[in-house]
């Protein structure tokens, strides 16, 4: 009794908000984590987890502060930190709920003979695309799936179509992969919501028996998606879809898996329209080239109108959607890029001075074949 002993009365309390803030700074960084989705792949006839999912954890600091306060003024016992567990959307322990059961479509393309830079970009893009999951009734975006095309991801400089000409830029060759995805989605009968054909016919896309008109160009001039030319398709089902892709040094393969849609696809093409004659050869002077340089930077080719028609029916035979895929391939001429000292000396100039014959060469064109 303070009155009897002559002491001042007092009470002891904790500032709970301040305690919660202190505990958050002390413990949260070591406990909190976001959930991580499983990375999945296809193993013969079912989905498997390639990288396991991880539950999310969030420390409840307000509740922890209350428990610490109770312990401090009570039994002084240990306190178990309360936390909320958040499950990932793609849970390794429940892959069946995704509803992916069937191969819907396969696309392929051949890039054998590509220069090293182009082959590198194809293989990097195929690896980034592999394992992409498309939610029910969502839209697949090729460029969102592979992300920003830059050196940090392993992309290098290679030949690209830039406007009305062919030049070099980082990521040249990535269209080989977007073309292959397009073919898989086309054959699967999926609704294609964004598609851009190439300006010129590219021989790689017509290897292995593929006809012209089944290629897909992409463009990513900036990190702003509003500037992109993308390839997109829709998942029309109530289940998830999986895009699987790989490149083996010669070919790109893309498989699209999902629920069995029962679609029947009718494809009619190619239907050829007008032809456009090759353009005259052209010489371009590049002051950045080393002296004595003459490089052919574009090969001549005719222009051609090409159209494919696709009709997709449901399992009852009712028409779901139909579309024509029209491409106008522009003609091109041989383009020779030369250093300033070689101006006028490329094959684009028919009046160029030819080098003299060696002194010991017969001038009648004779000699030994072989």
Question: Language-model segments: what does each one mean?
Answer:
Residues 1-370:
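Well-ordered beta-sheet/strand-loop patches within structured domains
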């Amino acid at each position: 009794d303070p009155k009897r002993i002559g002491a001042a009365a007092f009470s002891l309390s904790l500032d709970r908000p301040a305690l919660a803030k202190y505990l958050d700074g002390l413990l949260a960084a070591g406990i909190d984590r976001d959930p991580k989705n499983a990375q999945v792949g296809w193993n013969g006839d079912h989905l498997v987890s390639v990288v396991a999912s991880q539950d999310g954890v969030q420390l409840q600091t307000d509740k922890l502060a209350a428990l610490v306060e109770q312990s401090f003024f009570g039994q002084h016992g240990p306190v178990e930190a309360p936390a909320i567990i958040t499950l990932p959307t793609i849970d390794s322990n429940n892959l069946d709920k995704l509803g992916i059961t069937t191969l819907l479509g396969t696309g392929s393309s051949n890039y054998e003979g590509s220069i090293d830079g182009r082959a590198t970009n194809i293989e990097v893009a195929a690896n980034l695309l592999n394992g992409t999951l498309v939610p029910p009734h969502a839209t697949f975006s090729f460029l969102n799936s592979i992300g920003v095309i830059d050196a940090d991801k392993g992309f290098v400089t290679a030949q690209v179509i830039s406007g009305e000409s062919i030049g070099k830029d980082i990521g040249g060759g990535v269209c080989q992969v977007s073309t292959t995805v397009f073919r898989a989605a086309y054959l699967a009968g999926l609704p294609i919501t964004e598609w851009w054909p190439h300006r010129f016919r590219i021989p790689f896309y017509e290897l292995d028996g593929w006809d012209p008109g089944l290629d897909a160009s992409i463009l990513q001039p900036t990190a702003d998606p509003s500037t992109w030319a993308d390839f997109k398709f829709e998942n029309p089902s109530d289940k998830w879809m999986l895009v699987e892709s790989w490149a083996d040094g010669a070919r790109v393969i893309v498989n699209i898996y999902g629920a069995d849609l029962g679609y029947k696809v009718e494809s009619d093409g190619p239907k050829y329209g007008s032809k456009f004659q090759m353009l005259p050869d052209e010489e371009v002077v590049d002051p950045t080239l080393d002296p004595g340089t003459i490089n052919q930077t574009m090969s001549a080719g005719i222009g051609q109108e090409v159209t494919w028609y696709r009709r997709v029916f449901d399992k009852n035979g009712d028409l779901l959607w139909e579309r024509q895929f029209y491409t106008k391939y522009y003609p091109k001429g041989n383009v020779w890029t030369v250093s300033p000292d070689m101006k006028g000396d490329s094959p684009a100039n028919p009046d160029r001075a030819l080098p003299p014959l060696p002194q010991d060469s017969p001038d009648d064109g004779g000699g030994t074949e072989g």
